[in-house]
Amino acid sequence: MAALMLQGTGSDVGKSVLVAGLCRALANRGLRVRPFKPQNMSNNAAVTIDGGEIGRAQALQALACRTPPHSDMNPVLLKPQADRTSQLIVHGRVRGTLGSGNFRAGRGALLPDVLESYGRLRRQCDIVIVEGAGSPAEINLRAGDIANMGFARAARVPVVLVGDIDRGGVIAAIVGTRTVIDAEDAAMIKGFVINKFRGDPALFDDGYRAIAERSGWPGLGVVPWLAAAARLPSEDAVILERRADAREGRRIVACPILPRIANFDDLDPLKQEPGVELLMVPPGQPIPAEAAIIVLPGSKATIADLAALRREGWDIDIKAHHRRGGLILGLCGGYQMLGTRIADPLGIEGAASEVEGLGLLDVTTELAPAKTLREVTGTAWNSPVAGYEMHMGATVGTDTARPFARIDGGGGEGAINAAGNVIGTYIHGLLASPALRSALLAKIGVAGNGRDHGADVDAALDDIAAELAIHIDIGALLRIAAHPV
């Protein structure tokens, strides 16, 4: 069994996309491939085939491998709830809540969990493609590390270092990494890849050679800016692009960017609809009055994010939109916010508390320790819907008598107000269902294009894989992967 780990000179250098692309390129060669990320920090999570949860980036990488996502692919997941507090997920299950200092001090104890998952994956496939987190150059975090060199050395997995040339300073980033890490860690690195290059790569030939000479590592490729990456689900950052008016007569779908926004890739299918403009509203900006739909997204800290929403004055914008008869869709945490009350008697999100909701749905929510994790199928608005639930607590009330969806093998799910313009649901991913998305857009006079979002993502993975096959020496990567360090 072979294995290869991609580590970066920093965060956001494109490791996740490169891992996904390599997974698809190798799967296209007929290899059995599995993705692996020892430790991830993200509030964007996916439900796994074994009933757990992992980072959505690893779920995308599993799709690239043409295999179902499994909790072993991301054994340690941190989901930030506050600036210094995160929910700890191990093997897909909640293990508790940790402060940042506690995690740094105790993360080394999670290495056996990480190696256990990695060992199971190894036995299932021909090659594992591993993604690091942050950078091995963060030597202040080296003690107890399980995300980068701590894992690589324990599992004897060779490393390729990825540098992002688009942000500038890639020569210093790679050579600087070689300078600050110790000799044993440096020996794990078997080459480097330049990512996100724009223009003629021949212009970087001198720089490419200089990196190889100064680092002692061979170059394994220069990857161009991958336009197809924009067609993949969002992972850790929302593009804060705001326009005052809809372009070319498009109707605006507005979504406020909450501090602990979660699973915001729920909205990605709207980006491919020519009749709408998806507007992510950043703090400090009002939700525009011309919005046709307001979406309240998921949240990892519903009560705190509701307070933040009120501080921004977005509650005023939302209620004004409601009075005008505008459509409002609440997803998961956003659904909870639309109710009359949210109670957290056990302090799931922090101190025990009870707060007033926006009062646009006659429902109440009580948070509880048990987490609902399941994939669902059903019907809504006479259209098939498929997605997943991932929440803690239950929502009850009069408006649940008008459910948003009927779940196969179950009852009603979600709630709709009497006027029919306020909708709440726990189903993530529902907008990827073409008929359901078209039914929603029909309510604002827009014809949906009926495109299959999943097929578009799959095609993007193939496009990225084809680019990597041209610009990276995949044969060299396979030779490196075949020899444990």
Swiss-Prot record:
The keyword Glycoprotein does not apply. InterPro entries: Class_I_gatase-like, CobQ/CobB/MinD/ParA_Nub-bd_dom, CobQ_GATase1, CobQ_N, CobQ_synth, GATase_3, P-loop_NTPase. Pfam families: CbiA, GATase_3. The active site is at 332 (nucleophile), 428. Pathway: Cofactor biosynthesis; adenosylcobalamin biosynthesis. The keyword Transferase does not apply. Coiled coil: none annotated. GO terms for biological process: cobalamin biosynthetic process. Keywords: Cobalamin biosynthesis, Glutamine amidotransferase. Residues 250-436 form the GATase cobBQ-type domain. CDD domains: CobQ_N, GATase1_CobQ. GO terms for molecular function: ABC-type vitamin B12 transporter activity; catalytic activity. HAMAP family: CobQ. Catalyzes amidations at positions B, D, E, and G on adenosylcobyrinic A,C-diamide. NH(2) groups are provided by glutamine, and one molecule of ATP is hydrogenolyzed for each amidation. Belongs to the CobB/CobQ family. CobQ subfamily. This is Cobyric acid synthase. The lineage of its organism: Bacteria, Pseudomonadati, Pseudomonadota, Alphaproteobacteria, Sphingomonadales.
